[in-house]
């Protein structure tokens, strides 16, 4: 029996499993999924878990079940591409085809104290730790959120909804929030923060983090806790692979989402160097094309000379439970409709992933 080994139970590999099972996987193949957790975490909702507006149960789903699908739970400590072996804990798992989708972790940009003194939301365990902190903060406390990208905006707004009795400061490097999107969208988000008493600090440059202080352009600002959302990078085991990578640490891939030196190895999600933000949507689009490549290969057909471009539709974010913002097909949507859109996307994902 040949072995398709999937590393990481995130959005990309979930889509691959659902596309292949029950009828597309060749009869001489089995799938093994490796993950640290015995469930699929809804990473796009970790901000709500960290703020306490969603429960742990609401941000996870069961993995699919099939007679030719099995699981190995544990941390991947080594990937040997030459020997086609992956080390998980004390076990080694071999493969015929490998898909690396181990996701990302926080990038602290060598800022002193950032890793030691910041709370984060990139991984579920970190979001749980952040939840404990946000739930136990005394009234009147100040939380500094470093980074005003999508994650920073969502955790700051969700925290405002769950803790109306604390002060929130959102540190943004740019002149305006979400500078890559239309000014109308930025102004809407900024206005929401003003109306909901979240202080946005533009032109920020956090140079140091202490237990109860953030240093912004060398100015010491007192905070009771810091939440870091200022960048991500592939997990360390992926960054340590001796293959070509971009400056971001993400792995260079060809149009078939393979590493150029080994057609048996595919990269999906946050670990892949793509001309798009590393999002759940991008990972799922990649996964669909990877399955198409599998089908060509298994049918002994020549791969297309040019793969279609990934059709990333846009971005949707929430501002608490009632408002949101979206940029879809070059159209800006704000307010209640955008929030309904985000809830609908999540509902459809859960429905299709069952």
Task: Describe the predicted segments one by one.
Residues 1-69, 154-180:
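Beta1-alpha1 glycine-rich phosphate/pyrophosphate-binding loop at the start
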Residues 1-7, 28, 68-141, 214-216, ...:
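FAD-binding core/adjacent interface of flavoenzyme oxidoreductases
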Residues 36-41, 47, 51, 101-136, ...:
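Glycine-rich active-site loop/strand segments that organize a redox cofactor
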Residues 71, 93, 164-255:
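A Rossmann-like FAD-binding core segment of flavoenzymes
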Residues 77-79, 207, 317:
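Conserved positions in beta-strands of structured domains
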Residues 116-139, 222-292, 296:
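FAD-site-proximal beta/loop scaffold in flavoenzymes
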Residues 131-168:
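Rossmann-like NAD(P)H-binding beta-loop-alpha module
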Residues 286-354:
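C-terminal, flexible cofactor-proximal segment of oxidoreductases
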């Amino acid at each position: 029996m040949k072995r398709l080994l999937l590393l990481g139970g995130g959005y990309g590999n979930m889509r691959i499993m659902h596309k292949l099972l029950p009828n597309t996987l060749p009869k001489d193949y089995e799938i093994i999924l490796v993950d640290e957790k015995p469930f699929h975490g809804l990473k796009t909702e970790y901000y709500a878990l960290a703020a306490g507006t969603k429960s742990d149960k609401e941000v996870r789903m069961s993995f699919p079940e099939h007679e030719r699908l099995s699981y190995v739970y544990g941390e991947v400590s080594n990937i040997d591409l030459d020997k086609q072996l992956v080390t998980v804990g004390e076990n080694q798992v071999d493969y015929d085809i490998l898909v690396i989708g181990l996701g990302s972790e926080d990038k602290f940009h060598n800022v002193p104290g950032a890793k030691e003194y910041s709370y984060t939301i990139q991984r579920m365990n970190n979001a749980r730790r952040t939840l404990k902190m946000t739930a136990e903060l005394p009234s009147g406390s100040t939380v500094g959120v470093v980074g005003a990208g999508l994650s920073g905006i969502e955790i700051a707004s969700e925290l405002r909804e769950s803790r109306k009795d604390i002060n929130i400061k959102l540190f943004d490097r740019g002149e305006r929030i979400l500078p890559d999107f239309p000014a109308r969208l930025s102004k809407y988000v900024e206005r929401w923060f003003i109306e909901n008493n979240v202080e946005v600090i533009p032109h920020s440059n956090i140079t140091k983090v202490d237990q109860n202080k953030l240093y912004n352009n060398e100015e010491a600002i007192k905070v009771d806790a810091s939440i870091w959302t200022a960048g991500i990078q592939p997990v360390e085991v992926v960054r340590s692979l001796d293959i070509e990578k971009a400056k971001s640490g993400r792995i260079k891939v060809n149009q078939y989402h393979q590493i150029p030196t080994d057609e048996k190895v595919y990269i999906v999600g946050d670990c892949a160097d793509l001309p798009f933000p590393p999002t759940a949507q991008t990972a799922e689009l990649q996964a669909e094309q990877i399955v198409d490549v599998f089908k060509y290969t298994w049918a002994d057909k020549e791969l297309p000379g040019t793969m279609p471009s990934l059709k990333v539709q846009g971005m949707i974010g929430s501002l608490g439970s009632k408002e949101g913002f979206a940029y879809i097909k070059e159209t800006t949507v704000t307010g209640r409709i955008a929030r309904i859109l985000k809830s609908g996307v999540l509902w459809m994902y859960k429905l299709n992933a069952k």
